[in-house]
Amino acid sequence: MEKLTILLLVAAVLMSIQAVNQEKHQRAKMNLLSKRKPPAERWWRWGGCMAWFGLCSKDSECCSNSCDVTRCELMPFPPDW
């Protein structure tokens, strides 16, 4: 009976260690995936600037150097427009 109790305790400890290791591996995998840029964002970015119709907050973020509030414009429009 004592041997069975020890065997069950060892099995429980091994299963809990395995569960902890799997959880750590899953978190590491999620962190790796969350650091990657989505394909759409990779496609819109060229050399550090945002291409046409990409999200922006200031002119210098756009390749055209023209941010219209939230999106990059294809080209800067003349001020008299």
Swiss-Prot record:
Keyword Protease among UniProt keywords: no
Signal peptide (from-to): 1-19
Entry GO terms, CC: extracellular region
First-listed, main subcellular location of the protein, grouped into a coarse class: secreted
InterPro entries: Conotoxin
Location of the protein in the cell: Secreted
One Pfam family linked to the record: Conotoxin
Disulfide linkage: C49-C63, C56-C67, C62-C72
Keywords: Disulfide bond, Ion channel impairing toxin, Knottin, Secreted, Signal, Toxin
Proregion residues excised on maturation: 20-44
Tissue distribution of the protein: Expressed by the venom duct.
GO molecular-function term, one example from the UniProt record: toxin activity
Entry function: Inhibits voltage-gated ion channels.
Comment block on domains: The presence of a 'disulfide through disulfide knot' structurally defines this protein as a knottin.
Family statement drawn from the similarity comment of this UniProt entry: Belongs to the conotoxin O2 superfamily.
Protein name per the record: Conotoxin Vc6.7
